[in-house]
Amino acid sequence: TQSPSSAASDVYKRQVQEMPGFIGNPMGTINRNDGGYSNTNWYFSSNWATGVNDEISQGNLDANIQLQYNYYPSTNGLFIHTETTFLNTLSGNYHLIVYLIRNDVVSPQKMNDGTIDHHYHHHAVLSNNINGTWGTLVNDSAVVNGDVFYHDFSFELPDSSTDSTYEVNNLSLVTYICERNNFNILQAIKTELGN
């Protein structure tokens, strides 16, 4: 059998092969748009601001996401309620994805000069996926302006008494709508918990 780390590495390699143009870090995609290095999806960090501004300036808001949550400290229970409204007529395979983020985690980090900073502050640490790798199917055909979809999720937060970085005031949810065929993100929101 294959080890989990080897299996994860194989998945990563396949995903990178599906997105040609990646030559190394720091590179990233901006909503899977062409226009990066050699007109691929991959942008060097020096071009991220321009790519993001270009994406924002298009002004195409196709969906609106609203999120409310209830947190019960006695059980670490988190109940998430979402409302997604489509603002245009679209055709595609739309999924709602919800991530749990730790806002600040102090942990060792190897620095550029080779030293280790044992008290490095890592920000926006992806900590869990509330509803699976590709989230929850919202609609896999046409949607029209005004279509509304509701979804509810329950999740048990890790115990903050064993890892204080899971204190509810250090947590956020990042929620987004993704078109699964081309991976474009229609809308994303961040909701801070406990505040």
Task: Mark where each language-model region is.
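Short, conserved sequence motifs used for protein processing/export or organelle targeting and
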Residues: 5-195
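Short, well-ordered junction/capping motifs at the entry into regular secondary structure
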Residues: 1-2
